[in-house]
Amino acid sequence: MEKKHNYVTPEEVKQGCRVLNPDDRDAQRICVINEEFRQGFEIIESQKSYKKSVTFFGSARFKEDHPYYEKARSLAKRIGTELGYAIASGGGGGIMEAANRGGFEAGVPSLGITIKLPHEQATNPYVTQEIPFYFFFSRKVIMTFSAEAYIFFPGGFGTMDEFFEIVTLIQTNKIVPVPVILFGSDFWGKIKECT
């Protein structure tokens, strides 16, 4: 699968934002948010192969030898091979890398919907299309846009934030209900007890 990097980085978006008053931080912020949404939707809409996808969420910390890594990789590969769906993730390491790797091995688009963070890893090498973001909330909108299912592996605060936002959006009918699959009953069972 050929890698595509025809995107504008968050830094380029910030530099390209022109507002009447350059000192108006709110106007600058609104410009960046608008550009992130525009670019994200434009990339997804321009690629017919992205219309159906499965989005994977989970820890960036799992290494290649961890059982969850292998399960995410093989599941993503199977989804890509048998259903032809694109695979999307946050584009980082761990579960995100495993999912993108499975999609890459299946020969389907492997999207990395990335965010630049201090002290975090680079985009994983299995991403064939990167869509970079500065703001978490605009990134989450794009991560949910064309998904036919959401698959959650154990993770930290970022994974939990994504999980709770998505199930709340489904519960309140703000997004179309699609399957939410929780992988790892020891981890997710505790949350299920609370609901």
Locations of regions flagged by a protein language model:
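Short glycine-rich anion-binding loops that position phosphate/pyrophosphate groups of nucleotides
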Residues: 59-62, 116-118, 155-159
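Alpha-helical elements of the RecA-like P-loop NTPase motor core of helicases
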Residues: 97, 161, 189
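Active-site/ligand-binding-proximal alpha/beta "capping" segment
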Residues: 134-186
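Short amphipathic alpha-helical segments
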Residues: 100-101, 162-165, 193-195
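Acidic/glycine-enriched connector segments
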Residues: 94-154
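Glycine-rich beta-alpha loop segments
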Residues: 2-10, 17-113
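Active-site catalytic pocket residues across diverse enzymes, especially alpha/beta-hydrolases
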Residues: 103, 170-173, 195
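Amphipathic, Lys/Arg-enriched alpha-helical "gate/interface" segment within cytosolic domains
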Residues: 7-15, 53, 118-127, 137-140, ...
